[in-house]
Amino acid sequence: MFLRLFKYLWPERYLPEAKKGDPFENPPTPLHSRTGVLMVNLGTPDAPTARDIRRYLGQFLSDPRVIEIPRYIWYPILFGPVLTFRPKKLAPKYAGIWMDGGSPLLVWSQRQAEAVTAQLREDGFDVPVALAMRYGNPSIADAITGLRGQGCDRIVVVPLYPQYAASTTATAVDAVTRHVARLRDQPALRFIKRFYDHPGYIDAQAARIADFWNMHGRPEKLVMSFHGLPRYSIELGDPYYRDCLATAELLRAKL
């Protein structure tokens, strides 16, 4: 027991001769830093089958950030009728929109990540970009492992939600930090919380709308639709509703 303790306290005295010396003389990893980007979207089933949809819904709907009611009330409902019957009903609908590369969300998210990679290279930045899904694949764990394998010891995490909500952005942050907490050599993390009012985002949205108007004519009214949240989420402090109003007003002014 004492020998093990001494080896722990003074390992250099018990290491073979070849392993002694300055530990920084031949470091196991490069000392320079490299930044990577992790883009996180919501998630998707792996295939438009009841089995894969059930797995996806189980992950998604068991997240306490998404369903904020007591587990003892919700779980019997979720693992009873919801996961028993809902996947079979959804499978034909998923199959109807499925693309060659997977679900539309996955395909377009991958294209978005590729476009960000290309833009960074064009701007002169050697920055790896990885895509992850909060629920399903590609997983956050695999994406971080991939970035670490490319030498990234700093990771900028970008949840792909312009407006902040606990059920979207916060749960992505939870998942990333939970995985990194298990690592011995942890990368430095920086999170982009939201970008609802960023000029680049507003300009991009305005340009898409203007392009549509140029092709089809300018309508009398423009309806801006955002994903909904339960009222209690707003009452508990989610800034999502305010963010949506601000985005709409900025777009209105831009157009």
Where are these regions (language model features)?
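Active-site-proximal alpha-helix that buttresses catalytic centers in soluble enzyme cores
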Residues: F2-L255
